[in-house]
Amino acid sequence: MQPQEVDLMENSTMRNGARVLPPEAISKRHIGPYIIRETLGEGSFGKVKLATHYKTQQKVALKFISRQLLKKSDMHMRVEREISYLKLLRHPHIIKLYDVITTPTDIVMVIEYAGGELFDYIVEKKRMTEDEGRRFFQQIICAIEYCHRHKIVHRDLKPENLLLDDNLNVKIADFGLSNIMTDGNFLKTSCGSPNYAAPEVINGKLYAGPEVDVWSCGIVLYVMLVGRLPFDDEFIPNLFKKVNSCVYVMPDFLSPGAQSLIRRMIVADPMQRITIQEIRRDPWFNVNLPDYLRPMEEVQGSYADSRIVSKLGEAMGFSEDYIVEALRSDENNEVKEAYNLLHENQVIQEKSHLSKSKRVDSFLSVSPPAFSEYTSELQKKSKQELIDPTLEGPRWTVSDPPTYAKQTIDSNICVLVPTAEKNKLEMRTLADAASAVDTSQSTRKKSRRNKWHFGVRCRGDAPEILLAVYRALQRAGAQFTVPKPVNGKYRSDMYTIKSRWEIPHCKREGKNTYAYIELQLYEVMPGCFMLDVKSNGYKDIYSHPERTADHGMDDLKSSFPFLDLCAMLVCKLFSA
């Protein structure tokens, strides 16, 4: 039975950026104005279904996320925050999140539908010409650059996650929820797809960052142009050895430009690997680069654009007065970040209208585009050292301020916090942390360009380092459990510390809010360790147990308490 010819969204309400539908707008066969056609797949937290708009017949994908399973996994607050952010991402080569609908049982993400996969296209074509492969590669790199600029790293790029629309344009998928929920502890349990994963990821030494996406893009480019994987073995340990050795065959039929670019991307040492910005300047990459994908100049606005403020309020559930007040604040906040994102989206949209490329003029829509009978001929074809103080215990070092600093969110993607580079969005907490050390050495001339570095580096014995970390946590007011030996032996994961920290300004009568963090100590090389801090979300602890069942989605959590704790922890480590 098809929904009646009425506005099924008329009685819906908005809560924290998600649309709440009345019961009459939900059934087994439709969700609001979308008629469910078939199930496309099933994951750990629900199904993905194909649906069409009942008026326009436009296809969309509905991703169902079970609220009960989210509550059991203690992930729902992070999911809500991530959804509200992802709704703002608009790029012609990233799958769009059109809307979020909540029902009593599920969170339903309405996302752009793209029916093809680059994987299937490669299988059918065997290998592509350089012009064809370069076109796909340009779209992938520009989309990845857009996400890195807005603090999102994919970390699981592979042809299966690179979808193709009817016009054979790339649409990068799985930037968000499915990966957040299924990956848990990324470095402990998974390395994404082994054939496309960088050596630092499969070895579990460091938290994955932008260099990982560059490696994966290099593998994808190789596969498109050569028709096979550079590293492949059915026996996983052998595959890991091949990836770590970084020895692969470069075919003679590739042009010198393509060979040079691939060799600079597929480099085992992430410090020596080419960056996205360097790829952007590569001559081979820039051949026939469409106008809408060319780098744009930053536009510094002196006032708040009312159109952007309105969109921001709708997407994040904030009042316009609150948004304007946040924008006027001298301190950085999530509203400013989201505003900058929407502002860039607007600039991209204006550029896209001037492009000669087909079908790039509607990618910023906040709802599925109207049905079009347009058919392209293409669819008919086969498809980052400041100081090194000597402490009584281990020696700690903080890396030079990189292009970005990292905040992880227990997922296949990670959210990054930008530095003050180009006067953009300087984080006060990071500045406070930097002021705790002697910055006189930070201005020394570096022999190497800025890179991505994560965590806090230290030298010494692992037990001494762990003791220093526990002491720093104690001085910071965090709570933790000290590991105790069982039958004279310590648990195997003693290098992982789980802790929580009460957020002072979130304290209310009968309720305390805690930020949960996880610290992991990695051995980068003999005698050299890296301490990584990961956010495990936030949780409200009630003084009245019966209130714990009230676990709704009304409180929107920010990442700033986690960042404050990170800055405090670094200061305590250096003041030890």
Curated annotation (Swiss-Prot):
This is SNF1-like protein kinase ssp2. It catalyses: L-seryl-[protein] + ATP = O-phospho-L-seryl-[protein] + ADP + H(+); L-threonyl-[protein] + ATP = O-phospho-L-threonyl-[protein] + ADP + H(+). Phosphorylation at Thr-189 by ssp1 is required for nuclear entry in nutritionally stressed cells. ATP binds at residues 40-48, 63. The modification Phosphothreonine is found at residue 189. GO terms for biological process: CAMKK-AMPK signaling cascade; induction of conjugation with cellular fusion; negative regulation of cytoplasmic translation; negative regulation of TORC1 signaling; positive regulation of cell cycle switching, mitotic to meiotic cell cycle; positive regulation of transcription by RNA polymerase II; SREBP signaling pathway. Residues 34-285 form the Protein kinase domain. Its EC number is 2.7.11.1. Residues 304-345 form the UBA domain. The regulatory domain (RS) also called auto-inhibitory domain (AID) inhibits kinase activity of the protein kinase domain (KD). The ubiquitin-associated domain (UBA) localized within the AID dampens kinase activation, probably by restraining alpha-gamma associations. It comes from the Eukaryota. The keyword Ribosomal protein does not apply. GO terms for molecular function: ATP binding; protein serine kinase activity; protein serine/threonine kinase activity. Component of the AMP-activated protein kinase complex also known as the SNF1 kinase complex (Snf1c), a heterotrimeric complex composed of a catalytic subunit alpha and 2 regulatory subunits beta (amk2) and gamma (cbs2).
